[in-house]
Every structure is written in C-alpha cells, then in structure tokens.
Amino acid sequence: MDPQQRLLLEVVYEALEDAGITLDEIQGSLTSVYCGCFTNDYNAMTTKDLEYYPKYTVTGTGNSILANRISYFYNLHGPSATVDTACSSSLVCFHLGAQSLRDAEADISIVVGSALHFDPNIFITMTDLGMLSTDGRCRHGDAAGSGYVRGEGIAAMVLKRQDRAQADGDHIRAVVRGTGVNHDGRKQGITLPSARAQADLITSTYERAGLEPAETTYVECHGTGTKAGDPRELRAVHEVFCRHRPDTLHVGSVKTNIGHLEGASGIAGLMKATMALEKKIIPPNMHFSTPNPEVDFKNWKLEIPTEPKVWEMGRRTIPRRASINSFGYGGTNAHAILEEYNSFGSKTTACQQPTVSLPPELAAMVERRPYLLPLTSHSERAGELWAERLAQYLTENEASVADVALSLSTRRTMHRFRSFAVSADMEKVIERIRDPPPGAAWKSKLDTIPRIGFVFTGQGAQWFGMARSLLEQCPLFLQTIRKCDRILQALPSHRPTWSVEAELLKSQQDTMLGRTEYSQPICTAVQLALVDVLAHWGVKPSGVVGHSSGELAATYAAGLLSFENALVAAYYRGVHMGSGAAAPGSMPGAMMAVGMTEAEVTAELEPYRGRIAIAAMNSPSSFTVSGDEDAVVELQQALTDRKVFARRLQVAQACVFVHSLVIKRY
C-alpha cells in the first residue's frame, strides 16, 4: 500500500480529533472526501520491474484510491474523489468540499492533500523544465528566485456548515467566506501563469461572497519563487486588492518555510492563514532580501514581512480576513477567503461550545466540583505514552479541569484500552494521569456491555442529607429537582406548600422527611433525577425493580411512565397515605425491617395479633412489619435484646396495615 494512503488515514483521524468529532459520530455519515495530489511516485517505483508486480498494485497505489480509501475506512457516504490539477489540487479540493456543503451533498467535508517523493526521475524532469530552485531555496518575491524546492507533507482539514458546527459544539478555527476555481484558457504556453485569469478569479470570488477586496489585510500567495510565476501573481494581487486601498497589503508564501508541497500546497497555505487569524500575527517569509525588480512593491502597495507582525486592524470594525491563492502548472487556478471566527462573538476554546449563560450558583458549581477525565488508547503502552504527553501539555498550558474533562469525555473517540483520573484540582489531575492509582490502571475494555440493574426504594430508606452533595455539585441533578418542583406547583389542586429542593437542604432539626406526604414524593423525585443523570452519562439499566412507592420511579426508568406522571402519582400517593396518620384520633403507627424467616416472623407476631402484621416480604430472610407504634417499639426491643436485626423505618405511620385504610379515597 502506498504510504500516502496510510498517512492520510492517520492525518484524517488527527483532523477529526482536533475538530472534536468522534469516530462514532462520523461513521456512516454523509461526509464528502476530496484529496489533492500531483505525482504518484510509489506506483512508479513498484512497477519498474514488471517481473515483480504486486497483486494489489491497483488498489494499493492508484491515485483515485487516496480519497476512496478514506471513505471506505471511516465508512463515509458522501462524494469521494481524488483531484490532480498539479500544484492547485488541494485548494481545488477545498473549493469542492465547501461546494458539497453548500449544495447539501454532504453534512461534513474532509479535504486532504498529499505529497510524498520517492522517484528521483521526477526531480530530473522538473529541473529540465526550469521549475526547481538552483540554490535549494524558495525565494518568494526575491530577485534571486530561481524556482521552488520540493517539500513533502500530508494535511487534512474538516469543513462543516457554520450553523451545524456551532450547534454541535465543534472546535471552529476559521470561517470560509468564499471559494472559486477557473482556468487560464489559451495563452502563450500551457505552463505560463496568467495574471488576468487570476485577477478575474479573485474578483469573482469576492463578488459572490459579497465582500470588498480592499478590506482584506493579508494574502497567502502561491509564491513559488519562479521568475515567471511571482511577478504575474503579485500583479494580479495588486490589481484586485491594492488599487483602492489606503494602506499596504501584506503578502507571503509558506513555501519559503517548508518548500512547495505541490498537491498539498493549497492546504498548507490554508493552515498558515488559519493560524495567522487565530494568533492575530502575520508570519514572516524566509529568504527575502532583494525585491524582484519586476515587482513594484512600493507603488503596488505590497509588503513581504520578514519578521512576525501583530495583525492590527486599526479603526476597522470588520474581522480579520485572509485570501489564499493557488495555481497549477496546467492553468487551473483556485482561490479561498478565510475570516477569523472570533468576529462572531464566540470564544474559541479547546472544545468549542455554544455560549450558555449559567446562573451564578450553577457556574460556581461547575468550577469547584471534581471531574472524571477518561483516558483512552489502542494499547496499554500507547496509553501510557499518550498520558505522559497529555500531562506535559497540561503542565505547560493553562486549562480548566472542566474544559479538559469535556473534551476527553465527549470529543475523543473511546478506544479499547482505558484509564481515568478524578479530581477538581489540575495539579492532582496531572499527578494521577502520570501515576494512576491501582483502580485506574490501563486495562482493556470489556468485549460486551455489562448488564446493569436498577433497584428503586420506597419510603423508609430516606436519610438526612441525602442528595445534598449532588444538589451542590451536579448542575443537571439540581435542574431536574427544580423541574420536579415546577411540576408539583403546576398541579390543579392540593399542590404542596413546600419544595423538594428546600426540604432536601433543611437542617436535621427542621427536616420533614419522616412524614409520608413528604418522603414518598421526595424519594421518588431523587430517584427520577438520578435516572436522568445516569442516562446523561450513558448508564442505562438492562432491568429494573421497585419496592413499594419505588415502583413509580422504576416504571419511569423502564419507559412505562412519563417523568411527570411518575412524580405526580408519588405525590398524591403520599398526600393520601399521609392524611391517614394526620387524621384526628388516628393511632400512631410505625414500620420495622426484621431479619427473620416467614415462620419466625409469624411466631414473633402471634402475641401482637391485631396490632402488628407482615407488610412486605423483602427476601426469604427479610421482612417488613407494620402496626401500632407502641407494639413495634416493644417488639424491636425484644428482638434487639436477642441480637436479631430489627430497624425502624423513617415513616410516621403504619403503611400496608389497618392504619392506611384511608387509601380507599383513591
């Protein structure tokens, strides 16, 4: 297989990771792939000896397979094509990728460029044509420019429609304002660039985008350093950008830094322009000392920077904007316009998220809580190496634990081997990433998803302080509890005079959790909120079981009752059961869990016939009894003296007993 194919697969994965798109998200999607390339050296090398002709040469080295291999490997269903227009190939691909999004042919577009050199014969033919530099330097705009230096590179970019990228919370680095492609047509020679055709293309691209060329402050030129190419391109740039501008236009070419990547050179220029927009710095050119005499830099208002320059906008209120130009030796020209993303009022972070205004209490909660940071890799050793790189990055760069946890949890593909770190403090996070505790050692994930069962309790298991830490540290849990309060306050009758949130936060002296009309809806609300939080984390039950009023939360988890219906049923159940205990003249009741068999319980209750009865069989050796409070207290003391498990439930009445006949109101 051509190394280009293997490297392209790797670079595409890195581009998706940078964009915050997981493999699960993109697999099977309507994603287009366009690959720009020029030469096919590996094929030329492997087919020199026809007696040794690999069986899979066609699929392993064919240029068309470069794009198709990516679509095949990642299971992408949009358009897939390899483009060869020589040096403008990848910028033409960029145009096609943007076009596929505009025409709704794709929801995502992956644009790649590739240039790997193995065959020395190509160097010879290019030297014969006078394309290559005689001194091994690419000198854009310089009098000593004699051609370009061939560079190697594999590059990838991911495109999305802006509204979709913002809605998905993707990492947006720049905005594409316009793209265009044309051809020189007939001219003096097929390899001779045309200033007129390039100027026409730039003009039409800006007109379609509804932009004014004079507002652009940087142009990334094709800039090969050839005697024929540079003067014509810079003349075209002057014609379009500088005739009506008051200031100087900065121009440059990444080829002076990394050489000419030929089929991948357009993407290299796009990447340079994107980073310049992000950093707000215009990068310098190398190997520029004496201006080319055929270029009137002063009167054309052009400047090639030789030192980094802060990208000042002066009094301009428009965003920073850059143009990227590229042309092939066969006459195909391409142009793209990029704009900084910050101009749209959104902050660019490690993982771009839609702007959300949180109440101060929720914002503080997000900052101070501990976070789970999942770590993942293809092997234990690879995971250890990656973890060290991550720890080094976090040491050298400022980042919040919340941001890092978000990126690792939702914007990274989960591979077979896993580890994790949990903390609210970045120093401890770094320490645990480098030296994970035994429970967080790198391990292979299970081949099958474990079956999880949820057990839901009824009243009596509540305790002072329950759910308080979740209310204080988990915004989703707090919001769900407040949703419960809104539902209860919207009831047409018998709406509560209290709130679930307030009751959970009361002091131990003031809490009313022991009263049935409070405990049943509150226990249900807490369990409903837990179901939603766990589901948000991706934890869903394979089976559920509910005990007593816990059946209501269980039916919600099973999808049999809606959230609102489960809560309202629990509330009215508690209201009517609690009203029995509060009725004038009603006898105080109690409930108790005992660790005995049915026969043993029956024998123990014989002296209390009519006063205590079995309320529930929890297991063959665990029963709940219910009855008059004084009788339950007496039985508890007797069992405790004999060291038999007996624990009072936190209820104020004897449910499932004669005391609860008031339920007939239903």
From Swiss-Prot:
Family under the similarity heading: In the C-terminal section; belongs to the NRP synthetase family.
Top-rank taxon, per record: Eukaryota
Segments forming domain Ketosynthase family 3 (KS3): 1-340
Enzyme Commission (EC) number: 2.3.1.-, 6.3.2.-
Gene assigned in the entry: pytA
Disruption outcome: Impairs the production of pyranterreones.
Record-level Gene Ontology MF annotations: 3-oxoacyl-[acyl-carrier-protein] synthase activity; fatty acid synthase activity; ligase activity
Matches recorded under InterPro entries: Ac_transferase_dom_sf (IPR001227), Acyl_transferase_dom (IPR014043), Acyl_Trfase/lysoPLipase (IPR016035), Ketoacyl_synth_AS (IPR018201), Ketoacyl_synth_C (IPR014031), Ketoacyl_synth_N (IPR014030), Malonyl_transacylase_ACP-bd (IPR016036), PKS_assoc (IPR032821)
Pathway in which this enzyme or protein is active: Secondary metabolite biosynthesis
GO biological process, one term: fatty acid biosynthetic process
UniProt keyword list: Ligase, Multifunctional enzyme, Phosphopantetheine, Phosphoprotein, Transferase
Comment block on domains: The N-terminal part acts as a polyketide synthase and includes a ketosynthase (KS) domain that catalyzes repeated decarboxylative condensation to elongate the polyketide backbone; a malonyl-CoA:ACP transacylase (MAT) domain that selects and transfers the extender unit malonyl-CoA; a dehydratase (DH) domain that reduces hydroxyl groups to enoyl groups; an enoylreductase (ER) domain that reduces enoyl groups to alkyl group; a ketoreductase (KR) domain that catalyzes beta-ketoreduction steps; and an acyl-carrier protein (ACP) that serves as the tether of the growing and completed polyketide via its phosphopantetheinyl arm.
Induction: Expression is positively regulated by the cluster-specific transcription factor pytR.
PANTHER family: FATTY ACID SYNTHASE, HYBRID PKS-NRPS SYNTHETASE APDA
Protein name: Hybrid PKS-NRPS synthetase pytA
Organism annotation: Aspergillus terreus (strain NIH 2624 / FGSC A1156)
PROSITE patterns for this protein: KS3_1 (PS00606), KS3_2 (PS52004)
Span of the signal peptide: none
SUPFAM superfamilies cross-referenced by the UniProt entry: FabD/lysophospholipase-like (SSF52151), Probable ACP-binding domain of malonyl-CoA ACP transacylase (SSF55048), Thiolase-like (SSF53901)
Span list, region Malonyl-CoA:ACP transacylase (MAT) domain: 455-665
Catalytic residues identified in the record: 87 (for beta-ketoacyl synthase activity), 222 (for beta-ketoacyl synthase activity), 260 (for beta-ketoacyl synthase activity), 548 (for malonyltransferase activity)
Free-text function comment from the UniProt entry: Hybrid PKS-NRPS synthetase; part of the gene cluster that mediates the biosynthesis of pyranterreones, a family of antioxidative compounds. The first step of pyranonigrins biosynthesis is performed by the hybrid PKS-NRPS synthetase pytA that condenses 4 malonyl-CoA units ato the acetyl starter unit by the modular PKS of pytA. The acyl chain is then connected to an L-serine through the amide bond by the modular NRPS of pytA. A tetramic acid is formed and released from the PKS-NRPS pytA to give pyranterreone 5 with the help of the thioesterase pytI.
